[in-house]
């Protein structure tokens, strides 16, 4: 009976231990996922800024082109 109890405790502690490892692993994975999402978001914002900068450069030349055509 004593043997069964000690092995039961061993299994219990082992399962708790492995659950703890899984939990911390999933937490760190989730954190890195958040970082990835955040970085992608920042990249997207940077691209948008470049996009608007390009548009403000292109737009005036387009306006000139339209004016040339109408005259």
From Swiss-Prot:
Q: Where is the signal peptide?
A: 1-20
GO cellular component assignments: extracellular region; synapse
- What are the disulphide bonds in this sequence? none
Q: Which InterPro entries match?
A: Prepro-melanin_conc_hormone
Question: Keywords assigned by UniProt?
Answer: Secreted, Signal
Give an example GO molecular function: type 1 melanin-concentrating hormone receptor binding
What is the superkingdom listed in this entry's lineage? Eukaryota
Is Signal a UniProt keyword of this protein?
yes
Cellular localisation: Secreted
Q: Report the main location listed first in the record.
A: secreted
Coiled-coil stretches: none
Gene Ontology BP, a term: chemical synaptic transmission
Family listed = Belongs to the melanin-concentrating hormone family.
Q: What is the name listed in the Swiss-Prot or TrEMBL entry for this protein?
A: Pro-MCH
What is the scientific name of the source organism?
Pan paniscus (Pygmy chimpanzee)
Tell me what gene encodes this. Answer: PMCH
